[in-house]
A protein has these predicted regions:
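Active-site pocket-lining/capping segments in soluble small-molecule metabolic enzymes
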Residues: 1-168
Length: 168
């Protein structure tokens, strides 16, 4: 799967469309879409729903299933007991759902660089850290014209393998 950018500002939308056209016959399994605009860019191609679609309920899951997504990632904010109720179907067949089991969740996307007071973009290695008043360190990663600020505490659901009603 090729992951598409969660946000596309300005020329990045055209660049993303160009890259999709260049890779659609390259043997990849499809595209992970994280933005509703990706549905149009990938129309007719194999798509799976990623984190950026914010799937937290059956209405959203059903909408994306009807748009042709072959599987969907449910946000970790959904209670374990509610995951089973998010069960989309398309043409009478269930659409697989999944959850993130481990990782640092993105908290915020920003176009302005929060690290700019430390160094300019020309001297940046595209990684950094913001420290809050409680000394928590929030990783910052830059790319494709945006900066992503991550939660310093990773989610972990590896201790619930049988309790999660998902396919992956």
């Amino acid at each position: 799967l090729l992951e598409l950018p969660r946000v596309m500002f300005g020329a990045l939308e055209q660049d993303t469309a160009r890259r999709i056209a260049a890779t659609q016959d390259a043997g990849f399994a499809g595209y992970e879409v994280s933005n509703i605009a990706h549905l149009r860019l990938c129309r007719g191609l194999s798509m799976t729903g990623g984190f950026g679609l914010n799937i937290t309920n059956n209405v959203a899951a059903q909408f994306y299933a009807e748009q042709g997504l072959s599987s969907l990632l449910i946000l970790p904010e959904v209670k374990d007991s509610d995951i089973a109720s998010i069960a989309p179907a398309c043409n009478g067949k269930p659409v697989p759902t999944g959850v993130m089991i481990y990782g640092h969740m993105p908290l915020m996307l920003t176009r302005a660089c929060p690290l700019q007071n430390i160094h300019d973009c020309a001297h940046c290695d595209k990684t950094g850290v913001l420290t809050d008043r409680k000394a928590k360190k929030f990783p910052v990663r830059c790319g494709l014209g945006v900066r992503t600020i991550y939660n310093p505490v990773p989610i972990y659901m590896g201790d619930k393998p049988g309790a999660l009603a998902v396919d992956y």
